[in-house]
Regions:
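C-terminal nucleotide
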Residues: 2-14, 21, 37-77, 112, ...
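Short, histidine-centered active-site or binding-site loop motifs used for metal coordination
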Residues: 19, 52-54, 90-92, 270
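Short clusters of hydrophobic/aromatic residues that line enzyme substrate/ligand-binding pockets
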Residues: 28, 92, 98, 156, ...
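Glycine- and acidic-rich phosphate- and metal-coordinating loops
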Residues: 73-96, 128
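DPxDG-like acidic metal-binding loop motif
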Residues: 98-121
Length: 313
């Protein structure tokens, strides 16, 4: 056991296949260079703190229950009993759909293992973090957790080990945060309800999505930005068909395309959250500045190969 341990877990974007992945198709997800830092200290009683602006405040809401429950499960898994102080520091925008809840779960598990000198495997971290995600989202696919644990770009099918996609070039994507809050579990239920109205159509779209994941994977590896953009536009149309768009995200997608992006789409659950877009690298900075002028949080992200990491200071 150590005085303090730290773990940093990246957030994520879904490049293609969200919602379809819940129903057996594949998705492509990527870690991003924004994430969650968790610090673990010994304490006289269990405490959870999180950053709000420049202050760290103790959280006493229902939102901390999954963290407390996850801490208990992780301690049981490693065979330890010790009250802990958990301090969460995030540079992922609130309610952005960029995987903050998954990253919190992943970083918490990893930091606890480091604190007690237990070498948790990636699979251990994934399984424990998923138990926390299920308490929040009900029936998550696991793709958010996998992206945070393993890093890089991954091809993911529910119930299978993720496959990492290795790219020679550095891909940079634009992220725009809509500011619209939504609940992932409700959107998953909405998608499931609408798809049940036309099961044959959904089955055809599910099969098409699985094939197009291969096309997107090839486009990412070959750095074919125009093809990546075209496939993004297709997937966004699918999500819109199932009622997962929002007037604000639609406006942001139209704006990004008008500024010269090859493609743009909702990322994650939809209904708000964030939009991702792709453009030539020399245009990215100008596009993000122009969108920020409209009052939206907008930034570019890189896709780090490294997933969760932990250390002691």
């Amino acid at each position: 056991m150590k005085l303090a341990s730290y773990s940093k877990a990246p957030g994520k974007i879904i490049i293609a296949g969200e919602h379809f992945v819940v129903h057996g198709s594949r998705s492509l997800a990527a870690a991003i260079d924004k994430g969650i830092l968790v610090k673990i200290n010994k304490s006289e009683e269990h405490e959870v703190y999180s950053n709000y602006g420049n202050r760290f405040v103790q959280i006493e809401t229902n939102k901390t229950k999954p963290i407390s429950e996850l801490t208990k499960r992780t301690l049981e898994f490693i065979g330890a009993e010790e009250p802990l102080k958990i301090t969460i520091n995030s540079d992922i925008p609130n309610s952005s759909g960029l995987g903050s809840s998954s990253a919190v779960m992943v970083a918490t598990v990893s930091a606890i293992g480091e604190f007690f000198n237990v070498n948790l495997t990636k699979k251990d971290i994934y399984d424990l973090a998923m138990s926390g995600e299920k308490s929040i989202h009900g029936n998550p696919s696991g793709v958010d957790v996998a992206a945070s644990v393993y890093g890089g770009v991954i091809s993911f099918r529910k119930g299978e080990n993720p496959n990492k996609i290795y790219m020679d070039s550095d891909l940079e994507l634009i992220v725009v945060v809509s500011g619209i809050k939504r609940k992932t579990s409700l959107l998953i239920s909405k998608f499931t309800k609408i798809k049940s109205l036309s099961p044959n159509l959904f089955d055809a779209m599910l099969k098409s999505s699985d094939l197009l994941i291969d096309e997107m994977q090839d486009a990412l590896i070959s750095h074919n930005l125009q093809k990546i953009g075209a496939l993004m536009n297709f997937y966004n149309s699918c999500l819109s068909y199932y009622g997962l768009d929002h007037v604000t995200t639609t406006e942001l997608i139209d704006k990004s395309l008008s500024l010269g992006c090859y493609g743009s789409k909702i990322t994650g659950a939809g209904g708000g959250g964030s939009v991702i877009a792709i453009a030539e690298k020399n245009k990215t900075s100008l596009i993000t500045k122009q969108i920020r002028r409209d009052g939206y949080e907008c930034f570019s992200v890189k896709l780090p190969q490294e997933g969760v990491k932990c250390w002691t200071v």
